[in-house]
Every structure is written in C-alpha cells, then in structure tokens.
C-alpha cells in the first residue's frame, strides 16, 4: 500500500499537485497541516483518493481537526501538525505519550520543515519535511 504523507506546503499548489500526479496509485493522502487551501482544492480535483488532513498553526479558519487517528494497512496512525506537541524544540516526549495512550504504532507530524524518521518504543515517528520551505533545501514528502 502506497500512502502520500506530506506537510507544510504553505500555498505551493503546483508542488502539491505534482505529488499527486507522480503517485497515481496512492491509496490515501495524509496531510499534516499548513496548506489547507491548496489541499482542499486538490481534494476536489482528486476525490477518488481518500484524504485525511489535520490543520496546522497557519491554517486559520480551517475546520479540519488538529489531530486524528487513521487506520490503514493494519496500522494505527496518529496524525498531527506537531505545533501543539512542542516538536520545534526537538522534543517528541509529548507525542510519545499520546501515541502510547492511543495505542498507535505510527506517529506522523510536520511543523519543523525537517524530514525525519525514527523508530523507538516500538513506534515509527515520521516527519515528511516540507513541500515549500524545506530545511534541507529540497522539497520532501
């Protein structure tokens, strides 16, 4: 199962659309916030792809949830933007507690614009980076 995980597109409609065009077999999109306007539009253009968004700190007026749990491919996935869990301070302790409390084996978050994947406490922690303003210099998802 291929799932698109992305975050922090900050208005980069063309980049976000390119991701969808390059992954036509994607079973779902998990969007982790800060780009509600373009992803709302893209969801209307590509309604056949299941879409599970959460809002970020820059998604003012958006009615998406701040966090959600998605069950896909036998995994229980906790999705959040990360700003409510202090991830910019390079600390994921609050995310770890939340994932344990919700019995999730995968944690997805954004906000830092820095792609990262870790495995600890029997869970994957993944930040896809940013489509528009990546800290590493190249867009990532």
Features from the language model and the residues they span:
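N-terminal active-site segment of His-dependent metallophosphoesterases
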Residues: 1-49, 59-61, 65-66, 138-141
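Beta-strand-turn-beta hairpins that frame and shape the catalytic cleft
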Residues: 1-3, 69-78, 119-125
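Active-site neighborhood of phospho(di)ester-bond hydrolases with catalytic His/Asp-centered motifs
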Residues: 5-7, 28-34, 52-57, 79-81, ...
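Short active-site segment of divalent metal-dependent hydrolases/proteases
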Residues: 11, 37, 84, 114, ...
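Short, flexible, glycine/charge-rich loop motifs used to bind or transfer phosphoryl groups or to couple energy/partner
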Residues: 18-21, 40-44, 67-68, 95-98, ...
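Short glycine/proline-enriched coil/turn segments at helix->beta-strand junctions
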Residues: 24-28, 46-50, 75, 103-104, ...
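Conserved beta-sheet core of the metallophosphoesterase superfamily
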Residues: 52, 88-141
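Helix-adjacent hinge/juxtasegments
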Residues: 52-102
């Amino acid at each position: 199962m291929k799932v698109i995980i992305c975050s922090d597109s900050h208005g980069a409609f063309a980049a976000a659309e390119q991701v969808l065009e390059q992954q036509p077999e994607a079973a779902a999109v998990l969007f982790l916030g800060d780009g509600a306007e373009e992803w709302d539009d893209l969801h209307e253009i590509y309604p056949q792809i299941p879409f599970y968004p959460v809002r970020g700190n820059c998604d003012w007026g958006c009615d998406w949830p701040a966090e959600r749990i998605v069950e896909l491919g036998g995994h229980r996935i906790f999705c959040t933007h990360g700003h409510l869990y202090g991830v910019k301070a390079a600390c994921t302790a609050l995310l770890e507690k939340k994932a344990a409390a919700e019995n999730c084996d995968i944690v997805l978050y954004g906000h830092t614009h820095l792609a990262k994947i870790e495995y600890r406490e029997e869970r994957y922690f993944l930040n896809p980076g940013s489509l528009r303003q990546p800290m590493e210099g190249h867009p990532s998802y």
